[in-house]
């Protein structure tokens, strides 16, 4: 779904706008202060909305991220974005950002799953009240056959995907599993009628083996 389709869906929905959370991103080729402001204006125009709920810097481009963040602060102060945040920022990038501003990101969107827990970044964000949002929370389905995950899923009468999502929620993470299949989308949302026990959570925590599907943010200086 493209940005125009997303905006049209929001505008035509019978759900009140205040109950729909709209997030969009500043892409790498639009970073920098002036470029970021112009990019946001384009995104808002394409969405056909008066504001977005969350605007994120997609990647910590080394020479431009500070200026990009200043632009996001301006966008928020103008009331065009309710919250601002980052994506793929390591704890090192965040520490550098903190030295230039008093306004902390509300969110850091990073790759997270039981098989990639990114402990240093996760601990840093929690200690600074930055909400973690995990993308690829299902590891693109490539670890569904893991024996520990499969056993816990069978014990809960749930799918491995549902267990992975529930694990993330119990860790305090937001999750954005990707699917275009209506049945799977429904299953991914059906995770609020069970809990994973402390023992099962510990077994899932032990699955962390740095199984990464996307570029490592620590590779960016």
What spans do the regions from the language model cover?
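Short, small-residue-biased leader/transition segments that mark boundaries at the very start
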Residues: 1-3
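Glycine-rich loop at the start of a catalytic domain that most often binds anionic cofactors/ligands
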Residues: 5-14
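Short, acidic/polar
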Residues: 32-47, 92-95, 116-117
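Helix-loop "lid/cap" segments that line or gate small-molecule binding pockets
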Residues: 9, 43, 188-190
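Structured loop/turn residues at beta-strand edges in well-structured enzyme cores
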Residues: 15-18, 47-50, 79, 103, ...
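A short, structured active-site edge motif that brings together acidic residues
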Residues: 17-30, 51-60, 88, 112
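CE4/NodB-like, metal-dependent polysaccharide N-deacetylase domain
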Residues: 36-57, 74-78, 130
């Amino acid at each position: 779904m493209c940005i125009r389709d997303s905006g049209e869906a929001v505008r035509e929905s019978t759900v009140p706008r205040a109950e729909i959370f709209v997030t969009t991103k500043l892409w790498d080729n639009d970073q920098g202060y002036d470029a970021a402001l112009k990019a946001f204006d384009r995104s808002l125009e394409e969405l056909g909305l008066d504001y977005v709920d969350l605007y994120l810097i997609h990647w910590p481009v080394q020479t431009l991220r500070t200026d990009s963040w200043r632009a996001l602060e301006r966008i928020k102060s103008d009331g065009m974005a309710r919250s601002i945040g980052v994506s793929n920022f390591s704890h090192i990038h965040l520490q550098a950002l903190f030295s230039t501003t008093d306004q902390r990101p509300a969110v850091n969107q990073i790759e997270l799953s039981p098989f990639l827990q990114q402990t240093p970044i996760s601990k840093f964000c929690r200690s600074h009240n930055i909400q973690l949002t995990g993308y690829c929370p299902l590891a693109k389905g490539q670890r569904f056959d893991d024996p520990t995950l499969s056993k816990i899923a069978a014990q809960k009468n749930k799918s491995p995907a549902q267990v992975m999502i529930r694990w993330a929620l119990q860790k305090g993470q937001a999750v954005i599993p990707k699917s275009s299949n209506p049945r799977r989308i429904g299953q991914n949302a059906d995770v609020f009628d069970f809990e994973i026990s402390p023992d099962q959570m510990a077994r899932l925590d032990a699955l962390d083996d740095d199984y990464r599907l996307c570029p490592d943010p620590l590779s960016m200086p």
